[in-house]
């Protein structure tokens, strides 16, 4: 069973320290909710774990089992078994979705997947996600609705078959039925032993996927790591109790960094704007 271990992680973006000593671990078969106010380091943590070059690790380490990922490239981390479902998937005109997905699958597979096998997998996955198959013939995310983009991220997840998946607000832009469909897929994959680290600001998704644990980030640090009851408490009362009970002042949200993410982490080097 694969275990992701983050130890004393410090991360800077454009010279500003965002993460200030983050440590935690999680394993396959576990679903962890990552909570916290906007602008307090959750997405930065995901990008740093995945190896986005704009996020500079100044201290600490990232391990998947006994493999040190800290200085690996994004595509190397994807091959090791990590996946990041993006909050704002970019549109890439001229790159056909199915070609992109097949390149991503082959980039992370030990053996090259034949065209026949790939399209068989693609057909099965799109049906499970209740996606129209013609999305596969269009340019990557171009003209996709917000919900279609998010389903396309889950489609990548299903095809790439990682050990640990990080999902950044995967439920935003989805209607009630689509959230249920995505939750069903997450629950199925968790049952097969996949690990999930999930950011969401809505309790509905967590009600459906039932995390085993909840982590709260404030001011670039983990301030709470406990059971799922934290999710309900925060949904009902917000984050004010953190100041009252832990004596931690919640800094105001600053302007978010503009993130540029192109497609799947598995083929980051293959596609240039």
What are these regions (language model features)?
Residues 26-28:
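Conserved hydrophobic segment flanking the Walker A/P-loop of ABC-type ATPase nucleotide-binding domains
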Residues 90-163:
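ABC-family P-loop ATPase nucleotide-binding domains
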Residues 4-6, 19-21:
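Conserved structural motif at the start of ABC-family nucleotide-binding domains
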Residues 50:
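Helix-to-loop junction immediately C-terminal to a conserved catalytic motif
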Residues 61-77, 141:
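ABC ATPase NBD Q-loop/coupling interface
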Residues 217, 221-244:
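Conserved beta-strand-loop-alpha-helix hinge in the C-terminal portion
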């Amino acid at each position: 069973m694969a275990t992701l271990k983050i130890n004393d992680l410090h991360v800077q973006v454009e010279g500003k320290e965002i993460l200030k000593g983050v440590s935690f671990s999680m394993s396959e078969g576990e679903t962890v909710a990552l909570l916290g106010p906007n602008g307090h380091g959750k997405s930065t943590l995901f990008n740093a774990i995945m190896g986005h070059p704009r996020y500079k690790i100044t201290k600490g380490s990232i391990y998947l089992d006994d493999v040190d990922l800290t200085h690996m490239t994004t595509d190397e981390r994807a091959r090791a078994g990590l996946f990041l479902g993006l909050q704002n998937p970019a549109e890439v005109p001229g790159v056909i979705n199915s070609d992109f997905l097949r390149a991503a699958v082959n980039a992370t597979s030990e053996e090259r997947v034949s065209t026949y096998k790939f399209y068989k997998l693609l057909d099965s996955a799109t049906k499970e996600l209740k996606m129209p198959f013609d999305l596969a013939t269009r340019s990557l995310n171009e003209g996709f609705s917000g919900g279609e983009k998010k389903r396309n991220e889950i489609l990548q997840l299903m095809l790439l078959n990682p050990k640990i998946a990080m999902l950044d607000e995967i439920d935003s832009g989805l209607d009630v039925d689509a959230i249920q469909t995505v939750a069903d897929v997450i629950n199925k994959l968790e049952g097969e032993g996949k690990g999930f680290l999930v950011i969401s600001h809505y309790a509905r998704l967590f009600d459906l996927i039932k995390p085993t644990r909840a982590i709260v980030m404030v001011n670039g640090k983990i301030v709470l790591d406990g059971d799922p009851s934290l999710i309900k408490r925060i949904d009902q009362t917000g984050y004010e109790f953190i100041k009252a009970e832990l004596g931690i002042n919640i800094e105001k949200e600053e302007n978010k960094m503009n993130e540029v993410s192109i497609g799947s982490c598995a083929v980051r080097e293959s596609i240039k704007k």
